[in-house]
């Protein structure tokens, strides 16, 4: 996984929250910025405790940005910046149990 991340600028983690701390550590080690959907306060606190390591590695880690609202809106904004013209955006969110 580390070798794969070393070739990326940023990763978006949409996996179950149990993996986010490990992904944070790998992102810092590979000098790859990361954003995730979050889902568990204790995991997020552990990720935030790695802030100085991330700064030293020159990367940004954004934990717990959420799925909706959150990542879905961020991706919609990105799409409007890429497209020549946007009249409307419809966002559907399947939700998680």
Q: How would you describe each model-predicted region?
A:
Residues 1, 19-21, 44:
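Short, well-ordered alpha-helical microsegments
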Residues 3, 24-25, 52:
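Alpha-helical segments flanking ligand/cofactor-binding loops in enzyme cores
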Residues 5-14, 34-35:
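N-terminal Rossmann-like NAD(P) cofactor-binding module of classical short-chain dehydrogenase/reductase
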Residues 14-15, 37, 64, 92:
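Structural motif
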Residues 16, 26-45:
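ADP-ribose/adenylate-binding Rossmann-like module
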Residues 17-18, 67:
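Short glycine-rich anion-binding loops that position phosphate/pyrophosphate groups of nucleotides
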Residues 37-63:
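Rossmann-fold NAD(P)-binding glycine/threonine-rich loop
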Residues 58-97:
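Rossmann-like dinucleotide-binding core of oxidoreductases
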């Amino acid at each position: 996984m580390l070798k794969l991340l070393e070739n990326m600028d940023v990763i978006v983690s949409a996996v179950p929250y149990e993996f986010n701390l490990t992904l944070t550590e790998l992102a810092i080690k590979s000098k790859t910025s990361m954003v995730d959907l979050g889902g568990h306060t204790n995991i997020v606190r552990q990720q935030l405790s790695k802030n100085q390591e991330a700064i030293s590695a020159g990367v940004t880690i954004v934990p717990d940005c959420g799925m909706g609202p959150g990542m879905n809106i961020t991706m919609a904004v990105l799409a409007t910046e890429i497209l020549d013209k946007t009249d409307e955006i419809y966002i559907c969110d399947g939700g998680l149990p």
